[in-house]
Design a protein with these regions (language model features):
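Zn-dependent metallopeptidase/amidohydrolase metal-coordination segment
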Residues: 5, 10-13, 337, 344-360, ...
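A short beta-alpha structural unit
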Residues: 18-22, 253, 264, 299-312, ...
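Active-site metal-coordination/substrate-binding segment of hydrolases
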Residues: 66-164, 190, 199-202, 315-318, ...
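Fold-level recognition of mixed alpha/beta catalytic cores in primary-metabolism enzymes, strongest
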Residues: 136-226, 234, 238
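His/Asp/Glu-rich mid-to-C-terminal helical/loop segments that flank catalytic regions of hydrolases
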Residues: 159, 223-240, 270-273, 317-326, ...
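Acidic-enriched catalytic cores of C-N bond-cleaving enzymes acting on peptides and small amides
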Residues: 196-200, 219-249, 268-346, 380
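Active-site-adjacent substrate-binding region
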Residues: 223-248, 402-445
Length: 485
């Protein structure tokens, strides 16, 4: 293929990233990339395992002289979050990612880049492909459906893994090692809708321009959530009059902070719609001022169309929807004030979708403390009961606790110091990592999560610092050499 990324070493690392990016691999659509990995292994005579959900393990024997060193697992996920700007035409089920290189930064043309976690795939393929590297026996574990709830890692038969040292490659800041993470669960509220025929003038509200972001890593940044802003506007309009809601749709991923939301209301006549439009514009002005520092790109258009005939939600259905969005917890719920103020409990209202007969709200609560996670789930169930929603709790995953003693952490700290002359920062994150599932299943697992610098993951602004990826590969190879000694 004609490679776009040039001038960075090793060239093969970036070539593999481009090859991976050419394969559609949204969550739930990983067969193509999984089969690519199997073919890669077979072409090189490496042992390979593929399961029914397309997880892949590729095993490579230790390099000469390192046969007695403990086996090391390298791990990352092969799926990506699929999100795009509304103006971009892109079919994630059939189209590869259109890469853009500018000033040392890699992005995509109006879509998510997929460096989360495509760079991990490329890193492992490069290590497996290069027989000059000194390393212990390797088990490269490629998991599926991480972005929808760590599904592949949960499903994987852990007896296939002999390693008790794990290097997870799904961290997003160079110079930082993650050593513990939050657990979480996907919560889906559903409620039936009753519709009734309405005529009059429609008022369409369309929110865009918000930064969005990862609902764990970015939840503390006070960014706007399109679903909540829309609910705020409609709540005020319902106090001022009685609009009927035709539709309310925002977000596609529970684990992404919502950037865009669109709602359609219907009023009896143009005058009523015009009065409501002015109220909406006043609230939009307030929100714009409130988000000036944290989310300055926020916009919301207001349009009126006359002579409409629609099937709108009845008042009871509309009230249930807006009350749920106004009352459901969102954002930072609790911080660890005893240490660094890091987030301990949070929630994100990522998706609101109305169909002909149902409304669905998807939330992503997280906590680094199991008891608080359980208590928060109880609160969400109580709220659902009060509002008349059905609540479903799915894809729950455990947190990963900090280990006082960690040889692999010590090796990374020493290697980073000697290579770059500075200290590796050790952190915990408020997001789910597959490390928690592996640590739960593999007794005595010594794990660390690392990676090059990525920005704005899960959004169309996602980017990767190419020089950072270059340096990170140097660090990884040095660590493997030390672990082989």
């Amino acid at each position: 293929m004609d490679y776009k990324i040039t001038g960075y070493e090793p060239a093969q690392l970036f070539h593999f990233f481009e090859e991976v990016s050419a394969i559609p691999r949204g969550s739930g659509n990983e067969k193509g990339i999984s089969d690519f990995l199997v073919a890669f292994a077979k072409e090189r005579g490496l042992d390979v395992y593929q399961d029914e959900v397309y997880n892949v393990i590729i095993r490579k024997p230790a390099s000469a002289g390192a046969e007695n060193a403990p086996t090391v697992m390298l791990q990352g996920h092969i799926d990506m979050v699929c999100d795009k700007l509304g103006s971009v035409e892109h079919d994630f089920t059939t189209d590869g990612i259109d890469l853009v290189v500018k000033d040392g930064v890699l992005t995509a043309n109006g879509t998510t880049l997929g460096a989360d976690n495509g760079i991990a795939v490329a890193l492992m393929l490069t290590v497996l492909d290069d027989d000059s590297i000194v390393h212990p026996a390797l088990e490269c574990v490629f998991t599926t459906d991480e972005e929808t709830g760590l599904v592949g890692a949960e499903t994987l038969d852990k007896s296939q893994i002999s390693a008790r040292t794990m290097i997870n490659l799904d961290s997003e800041e160079e110079g930082v090692a993650t050593v513990s993470c939050a657990g979480g669960v996907v919560v889906t509220y559903t409620c039936p809708i009753v519709r009734e025929h309405k005529t009059g003038s429609t008022l369409t509200l369309d929110i865009s321009g918000l930064l969005g972001g990862h609902s764990g890593n970015d939840i503390n940044l006070e960014r706007g959530n399109g679903n909540l802003i829309m609910a705020r506007i409609i709540d005020r309009l319902m106090v001022a009059g009685e609009p009927a809601i035709v539709s309310f749709n925002g977000g596609t991923k529970d684990n992404a902070i919502n950037r865009e939301c669109k709602a359609e209301l219907v009023y009896a006549d143009h005058a009523a719609a015009e009065a409501a439009a002015q109220i909406a514009k006043d609230i939009i002005a307030d929100v714009t001022a409130e988000l000036e520092v944290f989310d300055p790109g926020f916009t919301c258009t207001v349009e009126i169309a006359d002579d409409a005939e629609v099937e709108a939600m009845d008042q009871k259905s509309a009230l249930a929807l807006i009350r749920a969005l106004r009352l459901a917890p969102n954002g930072v719920i609790r911080r660890n004030v005893a240490t660094d103020g890091s987030v301990e409990v949070s929630s994100n209202i990522g998706v609101v979708a109305t169909s002909d007969d149902e409304v669905k709200i998807m939330l992503s609560p997280r906590s680094s403390i199991t008891s608080l996670q359980n208590e928060f789930k109880d609160r969400l169930q109580t709220l659902a009961d009060v509002l008349g929603f059905d609540a479903k709790f799915e894809f729950e995953y455990p947190g990963w606790s900090y280990a006082e003693h960690s040889p692999v952490r010590d090796v990374f700290v020493e290697s980073y110091r000697e290579l770059f002359g500075s200290e590796l920062r050790i952190e915990s994150i408020h997001a789910g990592l597959e490390c928690g599932l592996f640590a739960e299943a593999l007794h005595g697992l010594d794990a660390i999560a690392v990676g090059p610098t990525l920005s704005d993951v899960h959004t169309p602004d996602e980017s990767m610092d190419l020089a950072s990826a270059e340096r990170f590969y140097e660090l990884l190879i040095d660590v493997l050499k030390r672990l082989a000694a």
